[in-house]
């Protein structure tokens, strides 16, 4: 980049509302970089009657209570969310998503559908790219549920305000490796979900593919797992995760 171009970029990256001559919003690009700041990878897959999300869990200080560090949030009775990005922004996004879901239920008398919540959060993220007194949140949000009409569902939103549904998805620094692993599986299976009856088997599938893609082993304290069924969203305890890891080891 020439000196003039560098000066131009330096000027435009002070404004989140102004495009550079190259058509870029630098502050939004920086927000995308922030999503990998925590070096956490997550993965979401659909089963026959459930949706499973798993995330790495890294506790930065040995004196921290590990139960207070989480990237998976229960948004409503049926919707869960995993966040990639700084914890403060993650908690802010989770609080707003919970408020939106609660307001929807109060107003209309039924639970907010997963796709509607994802669209709403994406719209809010897009607004943050237009206002000078706001900044984009440096988080990518992945919502999971089992919808009454759509069945097992996964939706993802990003700092630019884009949202889309997925058959399976990965987020984080090793996103490409995990995605390639998943694509290879679905190419062979020729169906768009994990053809297992129980959520336990889908959890084992997700953990196995995370292990294969990252080339590392996990203990029960290295992972978080959330499961969405038709009736509820819940997270697994460390003991439940240990059971699934033992089952995976026995299969090998």
Curated annotation (Swiss-Prot):
Keywords: Acetylation, Cytoplasm, Isopeptide bond, Nucleus, Phosphoprotein, Proteasome, Ubl conjugation. InterPro entries: Ntn_hydrolases_N, Proteasome_alpha, Proteasome_alpha-type, Proteasome_asu_N, Proteasome_sua/b, Proteasome_subunit_alpha6. The modification Phosphoserine is found at residue 237. GO terms for biological process: proteasomal ubiquitin-independent protein catabolic process; proteasome-mediated ubiquitin-dependent protein catabolic process. The modification N-acetylserine is found at residue 2. GO terms for cellular component: mitochondrion; nucleus; proteasome complex; proteasome core complex, alpha-subunit complex. PROSITE patterns: PROTEASOME_ALPHA_1 (PS00388), PROTEASOME_ALPHA_2 (PS51475). There is a cross-link at residue 232 (Glycyl lysine isopeptide (Lys-Gly) (interchain with G-Cter in ubiquitin)). It is found in: Cytoplasm; Nucleus. The keyword Nucleus applies. The keyword Membrane does not apply. Belongs to the peptidase T1A family. The proteasome degrades poly-ubiquitinated proteins in the cytoplasm and in the nucleus. It is essential for the regulated turnover of proteins and for the removal of misfolded proteins. The proteasome is a multicatalytic proteinase complex that is characterized by its ability to cleave peptides with Arg, Phe, Tyr, Leu, and Glu adjacent to the leaving group at neutral or slightly basic pH. It has an ATP-dependent proteolytic activity. Present with 15200 molecules/cell in log phase SD medium. The 26S proteasome consists of a 20S proteasome core and two 19S regulatory subunits. The 20S proteasome core is composed of 28 subunits that are arranged in four stacked rings, resulting in a barrel-shaped structure. The two end rings are each formed by seven alpha subunits, and the two central rings are each formed by seven beta subunits. The catalytic chamber with the active sites is on the inside of the barrel. Interacts with CIC1. This is Proteasome subunit alpha type-1. It comes from Saccharomyces cerevisiae (strain ATCC 204508 / S288c). The lineage of its organism: Eukaryota, Fungi, Dikarya, Ascomycota, Saccharomycotina.
């Amino acid at each position: 980049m020439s000196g003039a171009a560098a000066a131009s970029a330096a000027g435009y990256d002070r404004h989140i509302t102004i495009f550079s001559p190259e058509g870029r919003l630098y502050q939004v690009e920086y927000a995308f970089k922030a999503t990998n700041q925590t070096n956490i990878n997550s993965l979401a897959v659909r089963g026959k009657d459930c949706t499973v999300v798993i995330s790495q869990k890294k506790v930065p200080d040995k004196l921290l209570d590990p139960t207070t560090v989480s990237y998976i949030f229960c948004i409503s009775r049926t919707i869960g969310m995993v966040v990639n990005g700084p914890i403060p922004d993650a908690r802010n996004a989770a609080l707003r998503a919970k408020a939106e879901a609660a307001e929807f239920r109060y107003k209309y008398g039924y639970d907010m559908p997963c796709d509607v919540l994802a669209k709403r959060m994406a719209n809010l993220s897009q607004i943050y790219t237009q206002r000078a007194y706001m900044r984009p949140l440096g988080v990518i949000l992945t919502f999971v549920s089992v919808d009454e009409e759509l069945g097992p569902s996964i939706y993802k939103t990003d700092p630019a305000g884009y949202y889309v549904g997925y058959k399976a998805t990965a987020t984080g620094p090793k996103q490409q490796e995990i995605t390639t692993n998943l694509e290879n599986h679905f190419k062979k299976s020729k169906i768009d979900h994990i053809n297992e009856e129980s959520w336990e088997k889908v959890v084992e599938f997700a953990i196995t593919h995370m292990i294969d893609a990252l080339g590392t082993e996990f203990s029960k304290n290295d992972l978080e797992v959330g499961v969405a069924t038709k009736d509820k969203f819940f997270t697994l305890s460390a003991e439940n995760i240990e059971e699934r890891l033992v089952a995976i080891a026995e299969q090998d």
